[in-house]
């Protein structure tokens, strides 16, 4: 289903980068039904030796995490506001603990790449207000589901919290037009400046989480997310959710991932490098226990 017409993208999900490349080879390119599709080439077999690629890494994503700052109670906080704040703080605490644990896998990936002969080049994401641009996604999503909101059928959705889609769609109607236009102007700068990074390198290695996730959603640069191991027994347990059950995020035995980014329409280079990493690690062959 559509959520954001200028940010939605289709891509294969498969066991390996090679399988993804084979599927993308079959589905890429215009079909005459979508005027936004560019007739870019995808020559998986013609990439050549991946050793000739310049490989960068987002240095800030591999630095030690900063201490977590939780929201403090506001003056005159109501019980409902307190509940929301405590829930938000609990989610942030769980996310921070999981990220701190997972970082060992990211650092090990850099070591593995160096062992493969990769000369890693440190790069930085351009300093732009990516977080302020996320309202573009919400506004487009609200437009895509406007009939649902106006009909009142959005009340049938079970998740009705402040940050759940029904309420985000409702509040999107109050976005000032000036702020929406300014966010689009900032997005144009993001496309230009992130694209400029790929004048320096061909591939960027980064953690799967972090601001790059927001940035590449806005700029449309291709991303390949590959398995990067399984969490050990000491991994933080998933947090509880509203119904008292454990969330399905993280926990011992669950997989971690790593992200590779490339310039626009350089998906074939991306797949070739991801394939090389998987050949050297074998993480794509692991299976988490399902009992």
Model-found features: residue ranges?
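Short glycine/serine-rich loop segments
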Residues: 1-27, 207, 217-230, 254-259
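A short helix-breaking turn/cap at a secondary-structure junction
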Residues: 1-101, 279-291
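Short, well-ordered beta-strand elements
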Residues: 12, 246-249, 254-266, 270-278, ...
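Short amphipathic alpha-helical coupling segments at ligand-binding clamshell hinges
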Residues: 19-23, 105, 179, 183, ...
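Short helix-loop capping/hinge segments that flank enzyme active sites or metal/cofactor-binding pockets
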Residues: 52-93, 121, 135-191, 233-258
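Hydrophobic/aromatic ligand-binding patch that stacks against planar heteroaromatic rings
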Residues: 112, 214-217
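Acidic helix-start/capping segments at beta-turn-to-alpha-helix junctions
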Residues: 125-137
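Short, Asp-centered acidic motifs that coordinate Mg2+ and/or phosphate
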Residues: 202-204
């Amino acid at each position: 289903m559509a959520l954001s017409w200028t940010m939605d993208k289709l891509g294969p999900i498969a066991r390996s980068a090679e399988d993804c490349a084979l599927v993308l080879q079959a589905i890429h390119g215009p079909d005459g039904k979508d005027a936004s599709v560019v007739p870019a080439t995808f020559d998986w077999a013609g990439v050549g030796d991946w050793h000739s690629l310049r490989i960068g890494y987002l240095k800030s994503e591999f630095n030690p995490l900063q201490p977590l700052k939780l929201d403090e109670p506001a003056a005159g906080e109501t019980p409902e506001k307190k509940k929301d704040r405590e829930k938000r703080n609990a989610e942030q605490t769980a996310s921070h603990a999981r990220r701190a644990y997972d970082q060992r896998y990211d650092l090990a990936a850099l070591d593995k790449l160096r062992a493969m002969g990769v000369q890693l080049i440190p790069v930085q994401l351009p300093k732009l207000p990516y977080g302020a641009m996320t309202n573009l996604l919400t506004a487009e999503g609200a437009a895509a589901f406007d009939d649902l909101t106006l009909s009142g059928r959005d009340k049938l959705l079970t998740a009705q919290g402040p940050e759940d889609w029904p309420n985000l769609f409702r509040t999107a109607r109050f976005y000032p037009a000036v702020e929406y236009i300014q966010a689009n102007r900032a997005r144009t700068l993001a496309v230009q400046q992130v694209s400029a990074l790929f004048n320096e390198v061909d591939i960027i290695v980064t953690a799967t989480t972090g601001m790059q996730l927001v940035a590449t959603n806005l700029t449309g640069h291709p991303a390949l997310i590959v398995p990067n191991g399984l969490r050990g027994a000491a991994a933080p347990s998933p947090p509880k959710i509203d119904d008292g059950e454990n969330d399905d995020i993280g926990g011992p035995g669950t997989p971690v991932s790593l992200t590779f980014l490339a310039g626009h329409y350089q998906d074939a280079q991306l797949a070739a490098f991801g394939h090389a990493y998987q050949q050297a690690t074998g993480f794509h062959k692991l299976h988490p226990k399902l009992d």
